[in-house]
Amino acid sequence: MQTANEIRRTFLDFFEKNGHTVVNSSPLVPRNDPTLMFTNAGMVQFKNVFTGIEKRDYVRAASSQKCVRAGGKHNDLDNVGYTARHHTFFEMLGNFSFGDYFKDLAIEHAWNLITKDFGIDKSRLLVTVYHDDDQAADAWKKIAGLPESRIIRIPTSDNFWAMGDTGPCGPCSEIFYDHGEHIFGGPPGSPDQDGDRFIEIWNLVFMQFEQVDKETRIPLPKPSIDTGMGLERLAALLQGKHDNYDVDLLRALIEASAEASNTDPDGPHKVSHRVVADHLRSSSFLIADGVLPSNEGRGYVLRRIMRRAMRHAHLMGCTEPLLHKLVPALTRQMGEAYPELVRANALITETLKLEETRFKVTLDKGLKLLDDEITRIGSGQKLAGEVAFKLYDTYGFPLDLTQDALKAKGIGVDTDGFASAMERQRAEARKAWAGSGDTATETVWFELREKLGASEFLGYDAEQAEGKIVALVENGKVVEAVHPGHQVAVIANQTPFYGESGGQMGDTGVITLGTPGTGGKATIAVTDTQKKLGDLIVHFGTVEGGPVAVGEDAHFAVESTRRDATRGHHSATHLLHAALRDILGDHVTQKGSQVGPDRLRFDFAHTKALSAEETRAVEAEVNRRIRLNAEVATKVMTPDDAIKAGAMALFGEKYGEEVRVVSMGDLSTELCGGTHANRTGDIGGFKIVAESAVASGVRRIEAVTGPAFLAWAQAQEDLLAKAADTLKAAPADLPARIAGLMDDRRKLERELAEVRKQLATGGGQGAATKTVNGITYAGKVLSGVPAKDLKGMADEIKKQIGSGIIALVSDADGKASIVVCVTEDLTSKHSAVDLVRIGSEALGGKGGGGRPDMAQAGGPDASAAQAAVDRIEQALGG
């Protein structure tokens, strides 16, 4: 029996032998495609190749692409665990032709692979074609020898694929396997086609048209091929199984789940084991590709998947977190094919454990609420949307988790009611998914990149260089010349200026027209440099001294002081990354960075704030590595060779065919395209100035080095000297001096509060009151009294007068606050809430809130404090 790993290898080897380049799976987070939440097909990474935007040095490719379908248009989450072939994570095997071979060879490759290399019985195979695709039908007859009866023509969109409303499209042909008469189901196109007898195993898409608009479809000049075959389905067929969850890849995880939970893998918890196995795969691969659980976007989909698996672990009786214990089994099965699982092992394990530990706190309470509500639901009724929303909002139950929990009991959820409850809280809720990825780049950069090619960067070795201006852009348009005083974007054939990328800010400096010594007629003050489309370096600045034209020679000079400071900060981030991993653990991975001349910012995966001891240890370790003065060296190699050599890469980052590897002795080795110090000693000192949270599971460190460190230290000295001068104390005596002042302040605050209370209550003589319409009324303006003290003062007056109404207004800090207290015997006639609103309106406010016996409000007009007291008196009939 072939294992799934062997099947994947056979597929890729077959196409490699037939002239295809084997391309690694792209990350699950699509790059430069805001239309997709997750990579869900093999062709996603080739989309720009199919449309002609991107060109590669091969015209045939094959891949095994990791895919996730959960959330958005393609969402299989609800069915996972209950059916034989639904998954949130799966692998798609595919071969692709970009204007090279077409239908005949695509069909020949497919037929030879499945019947010869995989040995599938030809008599069990049948195919579909689009109803008018005679070319494909004839190819199947000629190449595979299939009779007309086993070539089914389908007139629907099931056999016509389109990338969107416009763009490449074409007919497709699907290969089906007949599992035999003992299984219910009819052939494709028949009324019983949804049965399990005939299962699609491979889809061949023939991209031969371009959809111009709704009415117009024209032939493509270079037709292409896009195929997709699910590895899990193919493995089930080749391993003699009719259920994807019985193939070795998933069965190993199911058995690991059963062992860890001490339950039968095929017993009452069969569905739960299947859910755990599938969701472990999708969760682990998403984390490895840089997605962390959160309450929005991709992170929320990950959280939904994880929490659904955690509920099923709970159903199996697990009282401790389960999922993280299964990561080793997953790594054994898939770590060789996908080394990112091995590299991210610690991060995956810790993230799963932390999320499950947190969710367990509310899971039991939420399930108890759900059980209580189920007992109240009558026959044919649904769970109220308000209850589903409470489970979501209070207990962290995604809606689909609640639906899944009710599925076995045959109970639905009032989703409209849930949506209404969600709408009411929209102002407080986080923004819903609005896409991700890079903003669509302006057309002008695409056109210039196509025309000019990549910019040559000289800045690794030089800060000054000669070049030629090859394009000018003003106000978003390509121009031939720009006049003095105008802002311009400049592209040169070569430049020492670094374009912002990889977290490193772009260079500034001066471009001088003409060659040095010839009296340059104009300059461009460069205020920023950016990279467009990955390798087009664009200088942004203002023209000075004379006009600038395309084709002119120019001298490019980077501002060296700023570049040096930036280089030091960039090299320090590498040392910081390594130190964090050494001190906190291998789960620490970079989540983002920003490097400039003034400071560095480094975001990393870690689940809790650093203690003062950890912060000091990290800082000391970075400084130790700086003092070793190791040489900073760079090499250019393939990403695979770099990672094999021990270089750290960013999970989910897309790298080209060659990468720069920056090593600092044996202190740090990372893939990086930025500029760096020559030796670690050039960085100077390193100081952490801030540590904070960015998102769940992501921390941020801000630090300074070199001249920025010196400036920071001098600023701290100035602050210390100023504080010492203000307090008339030596800097060393400041802690004791401040502690003494704080004690004095607390003592004075207590005394002041007592004085205010005495003033409010009449200084021991009783509060000043008047009788209004038979009611004792104590109304008073208290200047400078904090709003938080008003309720306590009102309670004191209430004790004195026994029965009555109190209104106290404070005008502290230019704002007015008002408290109204009504004794219990009067609340049936007068409400404190109604009276406080009258006072608030006088203060320019908009009402207030509280109880019938005590309410509080405020307003911006402190000058109307007495008017507020008088208005309430008038309302009582005074």
UniProtKB/Swiss-Prot annotation:
Using the UniProt record, name the top-level EC class of this enzyme in a single word: ligase
UniProt keyword annotation of Cytoplasm present: yes
Q: What is its EC number?
A: 6.1.1.7
Question: Where in this protein does the record put region Disordered?
Answer: 844-864
One GO MF annotation is: aminoacyl-tRNA deacylase activity
Q: Which InterPro entries match?
A: aa-tRNA-synth_II/BPL/LPL, Ala-tRNA-lgiase_IIc, Ala-tRNA-ligase_IIc_anticod-bd, Ala-tRNA-synth_IIc_core, Ala-tRNA-synth_IIc_N, Ala-tRNA_ligase, Ala_tRNA_ligase_euk/bac, DHHA1_dom
List where Low complexity composition bias occurs: 855-864
GO BP annotations listed: alanyl-tRNA aminoacylation; negative regulation of DNA-templated transcription
The note describing how and how many cofactors are bound reads: Binds 1 zinc ion per subunit.
Q: Quote the record's binding site residues for Zn(2+).
A: 570, 574, 672, 676
Main location, first listed in the record:
cytoplasm
Q: Which reaction does it catalyse?
A: tRNA(Ala) + L-alanine + ATP = L-alanyl-tRNA(Ala) + AMP + diphosphate
User: So what does this one do?
Assistant: Catalyzes the attachment of alanine to tRNA(Ala) in a two-step reaction: alanine is first activated by ATP to form Ala-AMP and then transferred to the acceptor end of tRNA(Ala). Also edits incorrectly charged Ser-tRNA(Ala) and Gly-tRNA(Ala) via its editing domain.
The record's note on its domains: Consists of three domains; the N-terminal catalytic domain, the editing domain and the C-terminal C-Ala domain. The editing domain removes incorrectly charged amino acids, while the C-Ala domain, along with tRNA(Ala), serves as a bridge to cooperatively bring together the editing and aminoacylation centers thus stimulating deacylation of misacylated tRNAs.
- List the protein's name: Alanine--tRNA ligase
Organism of origin is Paramagnetospirillum magneticum (strain ATCC 700264 / AMB-1) (Magnetospirillum magneticum)
